[in-house]
Structure formats: C-alpha cells, structure tokens
C-alpha cells in the first residue's frame, strides 16, 4: 500500500514504546493496512495526556497519524471494539513473543492484513486462556509465509515429490523436508503423517505439537541469524524451573 501523509482511524496494536524526550514517546505499532509504523506520541508521558490510558500493549486501538517521514506523528488514539479479558501468566509472555516476532521480521509500512487478523485472533485466544502452542505455531507458520520464508509442508525438498504419510523425513531450515534415506545425519526424524497434520493445521496430537515446535524454532532461529529473542530466554528459564519441580 502506498504511503499516505494522513491516516485516520486505523485498526492497530501497540508493539513497543520507548522514551523520545522528557514528555514524549516513540510508539511502534502493527496496523491492519499499513503494517509496522513508528509514531511519535507527543506529550504522552504527561499525567494528563490524552494518549496515556490508550497506549498499552494488546488493546485493540484505532489510531490516526500524519507525516511524510518514516517517523509519523500520532494525532488520535481510541479503543476499537471491546476490551479483552486480561492476559496473564504464560499467555501474556506468549503475546509478547508474538510482538517480538513482528518487530524482528516484518518490514516497515508493508501491509500484512492476514497476519494482523491472526494476531487479533491470537490475543483473543490468550485472553480466554486457550492452549498456547497451537496459537503460536499457526502464527509462526503464517508469518514466515508472509515474509517470503514459507516452509514447504507439501513436497520433499530434493525430489519435489509430495510428502508421503508413511515415510520419514528430516527438516533442514535452509531447504525444507528431505527424505531420511537422503540425509541420515540428523537425529530429528519427522513422520510424513505429522508433516501433513501440521500442513492441515491439525495440532490435536501431542507428537504433532512437539515436532511443529522444533521445526518452527529451527526455522525462526535460522532466519534470525544468531539473534535471540528476549521472550525466548524467559520461556527457557520457566521451562528449566518447571523441570526442576
């Protein structure tokens, strides 16, 4: 979508905010039709600022802004739709993880409308305390596809033959799924039927969930090129703590 000098009532979510001056902040948002946008919220740190109560993560917002440069000026903010129930615990950490993915991978001012809709759906699922792992996997899969790094769950990487349910495969982040008979050095083997289940978005089986988590983790780490997400560090600490109980 082409840039516009003035945007009004754009459905958006706050991803991150940082100080800009004694009274103002830079807010990084994810919007429905303009993707990631950075805005200066003038006076937002003042106690009586009109923005103060609205600029919080995970609230459905309508924002208006203006400007020709990459850093726009926030003009108006209001709640769009109903408040979600408060997101807590691991669900809250998972929501911050999605924000980190968005900030790490999405290009500025490119629309990702399908991903925006899935993000909103994910927040609703977190607020209802729905199972976390299927929500994360669905978001990760779509995000990688939207930015051009789609994982091919349909065909074998070398032969381009369809994935077969009764064959075993290994996953190579830079290639995709390779038949085990062609790549015997990997300790992680994925059943063809599991790959097919992931492709269908069917995470009812525990083995599918575990394999999907490993596949998406390796793929995201590969494309992060050595960078580690802060939320992932916290996840690992929680997992170690849970394992010691």
What are the residue ranges of the model-derived segments?
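Non-catalytic alpha-helical scaffolds and adjoining flexible linkers that form interface surfaces
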Residues: 1-26, 30-245
